[in-house]
Amino acid sequence: MNSLLYSLIQNSNKARRSSYPSRRHFLLGAAGAMIASAGTSAFASVIAPSRDQDNSPRRGLPLKIETIELIELYGRYTEEAGINGQQQVNPLDVYDDLRPQPYQDKPSGSKEVHTSAVYLRIRTSGGIEGLYGPIEKSAAVVVQQDLRPFLLGKDALAGEALWDEMYRSNRHSRDGLFMMAISAVDNTLWDIRGRYYQVPVYRLLGGPTRSSVEMYASCLGFSLEPEAVRTRALALKREGFRYQKWFMGYGPGSGPEGMQKNVELVRILRETLGEDTEIMFDAYSGWDQDYALEWAHQVEKYRPHWIEEATHPEKIESFAAMRRSTTIPIASGEHFYGRWEVERYLQAGALSVVQADPEWCGGTSELLRIGTVASLHDIPVIPHGHSLHAAVHIISSQSPMTFPLGEYLVNKMQHYYHFESNPLIVDKAHIALPTGPGFNIQLDPGKIESQTIFAKE
């Protein structure tokens, strides 16, 4: 058990009990002009900072944003069979015809899968470029239509000003796809700054505070059949993961039988892994308060490390009520958009762990602010693991008391960075700190079968 993290979460629970005694083909063509398509020539050279003859960065030049490009890459990868078919409870569970179907094992053997990914590239007048991704295709449309015209000509180094201006530029900017688009731009601008100063982003943020970032194994997509769970859980433990998160397969629509399967999953994991591995669970907003509390009361004896998104994130009072009513820590935040939402939850005593995502919540800049807000309440921030680049740099730059751990989606990350030549690698449940400038994302031309680049100066 990680005694520091355990202490953080347990102390936050003690504090709230005294303080509150009663209480997811890319249509960018219509949004911009296509300037390049098909082939891999655009990435024949690695993005690198421009340098003077004395090999020092051109720090005296302004970094005006000249071009914003959205690049969709296409290729293929080989997928391990039998790991992408597990049902996961979700808010649609209440509808019989929309409820996730039970898992069925796929045929043995691997298969070839077509894939695509979108990256954002910003070019500046100083010759320095920033690259970030993969980003959500739907958010890329917002970058293309709404943010690009606003950003062209602005100073890429003026991070605080640009974030605030993007946020104020549209009445819909406070959440959803617009905030996800702000996140993509913000992260790309941090990459530019790191390349400009020739240091990793975590150094710009004040780090490092450690030499590597510990990750927990997030088991989305794996079979929930008992023997498969035992096999997978033990394999992850042997790989060094001291924390494992599993995803609930059933909700209220599956009745008592589904509830017992959810409870059985907890029992199997605790008995399989013993007391030296923490187990966490995610309900992906597919339960309601009563269902969550019934489950909690049945599994408290197995000491889950947290239950995540037990109900819809809009229901702050339900989260607060659950936190008052069970010893199991309450986690949420992947669908938080900005520090204001986090503060409302924390003021209500509704969370033991904040899980904001730097790809969605407002980028690197906003997750740092969220960390400050959470630290005022002695609540740890463990970023949602939709992506790794920004999260690893942020975690490693901040106090372990505030950012103790990261999420590693074991299944997803096997292919999510398919087009990158230097993806972040987990070794013994840790990711070593990158040493290149910025986020140091490099694309592999050999893996890009075709591409489409949309840009408008």
Question: What are the language-model segments listed below?
Answer:
Residues 101, 297, 303, 314-430:
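Shared catalytic-loop signature of beta/alpha-barrel
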